[in-house]
Amino acid sequence: MAASLRRPSFTTCSSPTDTDDEGVRGTCEDASICKRFAVSIGYWQDPYIQHLVRLSKERKAPEINRGYFARVHGVSQLTKAFLRKTECNCQILNLGAGMDTTFWMLKDEDLLPRKYFEIDFPMIVTRKLHSIKLKPLLSKPILDLHSEDTLQMDGHMLDSTRYAIIGADLRDIADLEEKLKKCNMSTQLPTLLIAECVLVYMTPEQSANLLKWAANSFEAAMFINYEQVNMGDRFGQIMIENLRRRQCDLAGVETCKSLESQRERLLSSGWESASAIDMMEVYSRLPRAEVIRIEALEFLDEMELLEQLMQHYCLCWATKGGSELGLKEITY
């Protein structure tokens, strides 16, 4: 239905899938709260997250905050490298976007792609749409960039000229593709797909289907994946057990055995080049001035704990086509 963003028509309903995936949806809440806390004590600037996520009363551990800083920095650097290579003549698909604020941050830096898509569970999308409707700081950029009188919107979807948010299950490729095409996704534009702690909650077959669809659907594309790695050791097993206690199963953990298994899953899904580094490597490559700044924010008692945590998460990226754009040259 067509509706004004200022007076949108919202409907709320839950499907059996929403209920079954409650544990996975809970990880969205956890990650959002951790990011909000890190922003609140100065790790990085984000004026938008406060309008989407509540501030936790519970202080987060320094190693968690530094881990999120490295995650945000790493994904941001690769994203901006893609935008520079394509001169923003591209589109971005943020898979499992949650309460992510990248669209608004990129607009502030004059780095918006031709269109930015977010996809997540319908219940998460409904919640985010509610915040967008209520907060002018979030809605105004969407309206300012919109070229028509009305926006396409319902409780699980918003489609505007430069931004779309879609409620969909990433395990249902046919439904996902149909909804994206309704929102004018182009298979001709260079496309960046981003997944942060998303594939690990899918079975290996389900994530392979998504990766193959992404590799086969676009003439030139890049995929950024942030998730667990080295999960076969004792530390990894403790992480798995902790999540299971919260009714959250890492269905795809077998592809998180090593950096090599992460690269291989991308190459075997049709991507032409693939790289993977653990987050300790990302942290070690941070600009020295930034490291000094963030390490002054909080005292970290045991560096070993940070290293253990960072060695169990990784940043992976893969490219397909786009040789004339130099996509293969993108690295962290």
Curated annotation (Swiss-Prot):
GO cellular component terms, A-Z: cytosol
An example Gene Ontology biological process:
negative regulation of protein-containing complex assembly
The organism's superkingdom is given as Eukaryota
What SUPFAM superfamilies is this protein classified in? S-adenosyl-L-methionine-dependent methyltransferases
Instruction: Report the catalytic activity.
Output: [phosphatase 2A protein]-C-terminal L-leucine + S-adenosyl-L-methionine = [phosphatase 2A protein]-C-terminal L-leucine methyl ester + S-adenosyl-L-homocysteine
Keyword field contains Transferase: yes
Q: EC number(s)? A: 2.1.1.233
Matching entries from Pfam families are given as:
LCM (PF04072)
Residues reported to bind S-adenosyl-L-methionine: R71, G96, D120, D169, L170, E196
Ranges for region Disordered: 1-23
Keyword list, A-Z: Methyltransferase, S-adenosyl-L-methionine, Transferase
A GO term for molecular function = protein C-terminal leucine carboxyl O-methyltransferase activity
Described function = Methylates the carboxyl group of the C-terminal leucine residue of protein phosphatase 2A catalytic subunits to form alpha-leucine ester residues.
Record's family? Belongs to the methyltransferase superfamily. LCMT family.
* UniProt protein name: Leucine carboxyl methyltransferase 1
